[in-house]
Design a protein with these regions (language model features):
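Ferredoxin-reductase
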Residues: 1-49, 105
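A generic structural signal for residues embedded in beta-strands
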Residues: 2-4, 53, 199
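Short, surface-exposed secondary-structure boundary micro-motifs
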Residues: 5-7, 56, 202
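N-terminal [4Fe-4S]-dependent radical SAM core
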Residues: 8-9, 173, 225-226
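FNR/FR-type flavoprotein reductase catalytic core
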Residues: 37-186
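Local cysteine-cluster metal-coordination motifs and their immediate loop/turn environment
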Residues: 162-164, 184-215
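Short microdomains enriched in Cys/His and/or Lys/Arg
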Residues: 211-226
């Protein structure tokens, strides 16, 4: 979570996935889309400015149990692509094959694809809602078509908006493929105290994204209560 110091507003930190890191250099990379006052403030910070960081928080994608030669899929919607450069590095190190499904509303939203040049060991499938780049339609439909054509994955990793997750849960459920969703929720404290990032659950009333997630299996989310 990122806090801009010496500002009256915004009051709360902004939560981001770590896109990449350089432990030796003490650096991390964040991919930020300007949406509201918090991200707008970060956008105009001069180079060399100081910000406060809190983290890393929550859990992470499961990679350690994947065997060499396994095949997985990554599904990213828009800025939901943010956590995947780091995940792809871990998959490559484990010799895991991976296809990337990257979706957005239009070609402009898919400009993030250049961040993945040389990182994806398998195929990169682009989808845009308006058909301006790649396959026309939702990225979840692109994955379903691959399943229908015989593609097989041992796991699907995903990050994006909740409507995409709801559709993707049906796709992976029909295919019988386990999945892990990096959920996007507005986080206030980062420790599970404020309950600002709760998601309806199936095994319990609510899941706290910052402490029980943000990586959740689709079976644990009550999609009919979103």
């Amino acid at each position: 979570m990122v806090e801009v110091p010496d500002r009256m507003r915004p009051y709360l930190r902004r939560a981001y996935s770590v896109a990449d890191s350089n432990p030796r250099g003490g650096e991390i990379e964040l991919l930020i889309k300007t949406i509201g006052p918090g991200t707008a403030t970060l956008e105009v910070l001069p180079e060399g400015s100081t910000v406060r960081l809190l983290g890393p928080l929550g859990n992470s994608f499961s990679v350690g149990d994947l065997g060499s030669g396994s095949r997985v899929a990554i599904v990213a919607g828009g800025i939901g692509a943010a956590p995947f450069p780091l995940l792809l590095a871990a998959l490559r190190a484990a010799s895991v094959n991976c296809d990337l499904y990257l979706g957005g509303r239009n070609a402009r939203e898919l400009s993030i694809r250049t961040r993945f040049d040389g990182l994806v060991p398998g195929e990169t499938i682009l989808s845009s809602d308006d058909g301006s780049l790649g396959e026309k339609g939702f990225v979840t439909e692109a994955l379903r078509r691959r399943f229908d054509a015989g593609s097989r994955y041992v796991r699907v990793f995903a990050c994006g908006p909740m409507p995409m997750f709801a559709a993707l849960a049906r796709v992976v459920g029909d295919a019988g493929v386990p999945a892990e969703f990096s959920t996007e929720a507005d986080m206030g404290c980062g420790f599970g105290a404020c309950l600002g990032c709760v998601i309806p659950g199936t095994e319990k009333a609510f899941l706290v994204s910052c402490s029980e997630g943000p990586i959740l299996s689709p079976e644990k989310i009550a999609w009919d209560r979103l």
